[in-house]
Amino acid sequence: MSVAGGVAGAELKPTRVIDTHTHFYDPTRLGGVPWPPKESKLLYRTVLPDDWAAVAGPQGVRETVVVEASPLVEDNQWVLDLAAKDARLIGVVGNLDPNDAGFEANVKRFAANPKFRGVRWRGGLVDIDKNPENVLRGAKVLAEHGLELDLNGSNAMLPHALKLAETVPDLRMVINHLGGSGDPAATKPGWDKGVAILARRCPNVYMKVSALVEQVPGAEGAAPRELAYYLPVLEHLWKEFGEDRLIYGSNWPVSDRGAPYEVVFGLVREFFAGKGEGAMEKYFWKNALVAYGVK
């Protein structure tokens, strides 16, 4: 089946959808933004909640958890200010470095806001295999505040994610972007085994089915629109994480590198509709309530 012309496939639709991975930013702000880079013709523009709603709303997606990509501490406040004025933004995953002397104070500061639901550590900015004492201390601080931890890039890989998840078992962790599977037609060596080990040994770890179309090499916006192309990755994640630990995230607007939002949503809707109504509801919103503590 194809979603090339929009959402297709089974008529089964989720009753609610929480998109747990969007990015909002405004390069025209005083001081600009450290991400995305000016060289990115696709991404370097003002991207705000109404822009997301214009593409997500027609698919029935009306709530999101925003992931802050900027490493600047005050940019966490900027996105929280957005969320304070917009009920569609039900949660924020911040960007705070455990190697920063002010990490614990900043966690305490932002955690006072009920929409602040966690922190993301992205490989290259925060490498969890370096400065292990700071990383472990930071992870425990997050757990103590009832927050979760998103991991992206090299951090999502074994053995680092596994060690952290087992050392701090009361910390909810969400692996971003399929754990960096690579092209579904030729996944990265060791990805399938790594995913299996992490899923089986760490019940506190969730997998975000996000950045699906961006894993495909090739021209911008030209990712395959046939569900069959992505099945090697999707079926493996389903086998290992099951219906209780898979979460929906679009990674918009970065997802436009692979395909429009309607295609991104349509692919996973078709896949999870095929797993039954209960599994689909868990994937699109119920699991997000548990992982992120949103309402």
Please tell me what each predicted stretch does.
Residues 1-20, 45-63, 235-236, 240-247, ...:
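Mid-to-C-terminal alpha-helical segments outside catalytic/metal-binding sites
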Residues 11-145, 151, 228, 267:
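Mid-domain alpha/beta scaffold segments of enzyme catalytic cores
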Residues 28-33, 105-106, 186-188, 219-221, ...:
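Short aromatic-enriched loop/helix-cap "lid" or pocket-rim segments at secondary-structure transitions
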Residues 56, 83-84, 111, 165-166, ...:
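N-terminal cationic-hydrophobic initiation segments that often serve targeting/anchoring roles
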Residues 59, 86-87, 114, 146, ...:
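A structural signal for short coil/turn segments at secondary-structure junctions
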Residues 71-72, 98-101, 125-129, 181-184, ...:
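Short, small-residue-enriched loops and turns at beta-alpha junctions
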Residues 128-247:
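Catalytic pocket-lining loop regions of alpha/beta-barrel enzymes
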Residues 251:
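Active-site glycine-centered loops adjacent to acidic/histidine catalytic or metal-binding residues
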